[in-house]
């Protein structure tokens, strides 16, 4: 077994030409820090797949930690609302991750729609996100980078959480993690304020931001810097106070300042007038300042907003 195989608990292919040649690359789907994602076809089955080519020159060991993390996590979790890792190939100095192919992500779906998601469609998407996330959290996985571009959507609005490169397994007590995670607009306030002992609640904040974005057709908190992001949040939810009913303990966070402007906030019903009472209630519980009071994915699935769901 290779080093990567030992780390992921799976025997990997090690440069066998026939294994690599099984996949015919068609076109580029995207490019990131560690490599390129292609649309490809499995010659053996005719199945369209997503082939992520990872460069192996980013660490002393050769394999980027984000790639190791993604492989090891996806080997542990299998769920209809989590993207399926089909194969792993290590060949020619590169690591290839073969995923099921889904032709849209939620960001593209929003752009194509040109407006908000409503009714059963919105409810189905949020429910599936919570199903996938609840499964992750039960298996002690915090995704840490939930955003529309990392959520795949099929033509029938089936949702699959993808891109686990930043994900970490969590234990109790919580480990100290870097706060440089999660795309700014979906980043939880405790991370923005320098908290390093964070919990799965950071994912629930991100889900709340995504929920609001789908419901209004545009980003809820659109900051252009960390402080700008905080102020965007404060203007909607009010500047948090270190007190019961707001965010007890917030003033002890490393980047909290007493001189923050004091905004009173505005009702979520005003920000999202198309949502009914149950939907606003669920969203408000996802966007609680205090992570200890933020609703969990498991509890959110039992919320009254889903009581009439027929999916």
UniProtKB/Swiss-Prot annotation:
CDD domains: STKc_CDK_like
Modified residues (Phosphothreonine): 33
Enzyme class: transferase
Domain of life: Eukaryota
Keyword ATP-binding: yes
Residue numbers carrying Phosphotyrosine: 34
Annotated positions binding ATP: 29-37, 52
GO MF annotation list: ATP binding; cyclin binding; cyclin-dependent protein serine/threonine kinase activity; protein serine kinase activity; protein serine/threonine kinase activity
A GO biological-process term: protein phosphorylation
Keywords linked to the UniProt accession: ATP-binding, Kinase, Nucleotide-binding, Phosphoprotein, Serine/threonine-protein kinase, Transferase
Record-annotated Protein kinase domain positions: 23-306
EC number(s) from the headed UniProt entry: 2.7.11.22
GO cellular component, one term: nucleus
Active-site positions on this chain: 145 (proton acceptor)
Regulation: Phosphorylation at Thr-33 or Tyr-34 inactivates the enzyme.
Protein's UniProt keywords contain Nucleotide-binding: yes
Role noted for this protein: Probably involved in the control of the cell cycle.
PANTHER family: CELL DIVISION PROTEIN KINASE, CYCLIN-DEPENDENT KINASE 2
Quaternary context: Forms a stable but non-covalent complex with a regulatory subunit and with a cyclin.
Protein name according to UniProt: Cell division control protein 2 homolog 3
Gene designation: CRK3
